[in-house]
């Protein structure tokens, strides 16, 4: 055959493929997610997320150390309070003795600036009803989340996390105006150097299912009045631009795998770093298929992460972070 172009020439050897790779995923771009639960003496496995745990404060530190030694530069902490500490407004979220703030403080004391300590800044784990904010009657008998009252509580939570030692706060509640309000609250409290990673395009996704086991949520119903409709694309661009205008230091798309088109579009216009969250359902599907020997666990996990990175994510929140960092170094 008389061919002018033979693309296979650049696939002939492993060295050639490495030389011509268009993207390269690095451990530093992965963020390890951890759950910390109050009132336990031993870490507890999460049944719907094989290999993941609800940590105690004592087990968290060595787990973070393993992540750091693998090359991870950022962790994201979620707190799971005692049931008796939950209330209508989630007040344990900003209690300096609450489980999440104690976990932040413990990590900062142990690791200092060695890693970026990020914390989830939302109320759903801390409210008795499991919603992401303050519930009020809309005047017609339907309970809804009060946007502005909730944002006020997010500000209290963000400042408490900064005071505990968080480098980054990460509001995930999808309330209008939350970024501007939190930035002002942090600055007023003297935390101008604490950054904000905004959950800018967070969808009302069925892929979040296993996460609710991980945080033992009391949630019933849905979050469709504040999280985005999976049918929508342009709305994400509006949400991301609003967060950038309000002062977000980083923006996020969640989930990642089924929303790579959104990741791509956001990455093309965002002047700030773009994160994507490979969520619990994505993780659980890989684990379930691998447990049945239907797929190669390592190969599929890395392919999924590389796809998210290829789409434009500068960083990826994933339950595979520590393992994937080791795999990448081996490769």
Where are these regions (language model features)?
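Alpha/beta enzyme core
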Residues: 2, 13, 22-31, 37-331
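Catalytic domains of riboflavin
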Residues: 1-7
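N-terminal [4Fe-4S]-dependent radical SAM core
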Residues: 16
């Amino acid at each position: 055959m008389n061919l002018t172009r033979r693309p296979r020439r650049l696939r002939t050897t492993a060295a050639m493929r490495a030389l011509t790779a268009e993207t390269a995923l690095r451990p530093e771009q992965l963020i390890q997610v951890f759950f910390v639960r109050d009132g336990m003496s031993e870490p507890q496995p999460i049944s719907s997320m094989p290999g993941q745990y609800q940590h105690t404060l004592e087990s968290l530190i060595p787990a973070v150390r393993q992540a750091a030694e693998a090359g991870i530069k950022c962790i994201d902490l979620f707190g799971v309070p005692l049931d008796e500490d939950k209330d209508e407004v989630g007040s344990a979220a900003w209690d300096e003795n609450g489980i999440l703030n104690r976990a932040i403080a413990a990590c900062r004391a142990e690791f200092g600036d060695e890693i970026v300590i990020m914390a989830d800044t939302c109320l759903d784990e801390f409210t008795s009803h499991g919603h992401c904010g303050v519930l009020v009657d809309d005047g017609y008998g339907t309970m809804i989340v009060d946007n502005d009252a909730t944002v006020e509580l997010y500000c209290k939570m963000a400042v408490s996390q900064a005071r505990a030692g968080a480098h980054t706060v990460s509001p995930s509640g999808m309330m209008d105006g939350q970024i501007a309000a939190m930035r002002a609250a942090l600055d007023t409290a003297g935390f101008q150097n604490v950054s904000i990673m905004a959950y800018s395009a967070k969808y009302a996704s069925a892929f979040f299912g296993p996460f609710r086991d991980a945080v033992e949520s009391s949630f019933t119903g849905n979050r469709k009045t504040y999280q985005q409709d999976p049918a929508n694309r342009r709305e994400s661009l509006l949400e991301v631009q609003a967060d950038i205008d309000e002062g977000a230091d980083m923006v996020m798309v969640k989930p990642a795998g089924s929303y790579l088109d959104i990741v791509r579009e956001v990455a093309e216009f965002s002047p700030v770093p773009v994160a994507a969250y490979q969520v619990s359902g994505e993780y659980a599907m890989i684990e379930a298929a691998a447990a049945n020997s239907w797929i190669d666990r390592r190969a599929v996990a890395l392919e999924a992460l590389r796809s998210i990175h290829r789409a434009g994510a500068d960083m990826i929140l994933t339950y595979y972070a520590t393992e994937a960092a080791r795999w990448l170094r081996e490769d």
